């Protein structure tokens, strides 16, 4: 049987791939989405019910992009008829967090924020031990529900004509004079453009076709901790938080995955075990568990320091932690979210759709050239 012809092929149906399919289908393109596993699988980087949405970055580029992403999250909610971002506010603190710099950048971009002494923050959020450094709070931060968001984006894409194929692992990508052919077991597709949003499988799929920069795939761990009292951190909602010290730790209300009412998901940003998409074992590192438990015991009053649940996730990172959003020939590279890409998902999909339709990358920093390729 010959290859099926479509306008665009999306490889990977995680957050970035689902968002890309939604964006392309809205533009009237015929789209085939190829996902190696089933819906809601936990093999990659997009699963679960809790990721942080935040505007606070020590980098003006990302602050601007979070604003654009926020507008697209709103559009998704309006089109799907449900909410995907719970607004909680967010705290940034710790000796390495650059709270003053981030406050100045947020205010310069018109983003509401407060910078306060640690003692004042402790009065408002008594469950957090802030130390001595200034604390940044911005009310627009919140919690993303990736599982519901991906399902909604795929549902909207399908309603606009996209076809989504689960359990369809790509075995070969081939460039052709008119675009590319994508082969799966027993079936092939042909399109002028292929968007590869495959996270840790990016290099195995594209390594022989596109000169990619070095990418690190890490298996990182996160843990769920139950509150000892419902109001452990003052009046609800509990804000997200990031503590920057020798090791970066974050916390976020865990949502449906929390395994206890009001559970908080706590994890390290990075410090994972190097692996690949196929080789990850899902085994939680005991040293990471000990560090998270110590942080909760010493830094989060009111949480039981014995975790009630734990999970692993994959980061695929560039050396700079900037994304790769670029096109080379018929291939759009939409990946390497470096552990901070969930909040940008609908914007990432919009940018990938722009690239697929002949547009330019939104910033030179996201190009292959900027990554040394």
Tell what function each PLM region has.
Residues 9-11, 34, 189-201, 349:
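Short hydrophobic core segments
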Residues 2-16, 32:
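Beta1/beta-strand and adjacent pyrophosphate-binding region of the FAD-binding site
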Residues 50-124, 132-133, 248:
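Dinucleotide-binding Rossmann-like beta1-alpha1 core, especially the glycine-rich loop
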Residues 95-166, 172-176:
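Flavin (FAD/FMN) cofactor-binding and adjacent substrate-gating region
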Residues 22-26, 83-85, 188, 200-329:
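Active-site substrate-recognition segment that forms the wall
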Residues 171-189:
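Conserved beta-strand-loop-beta-strand element in the redox core of flavoprotein oxidoreductases
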Residues 25-46:
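Glycine-rich FAD pyrophosphate-binding loop
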Residues 292-373:
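C-terminal catalytic lobe of FAD-dependent flavoproteins
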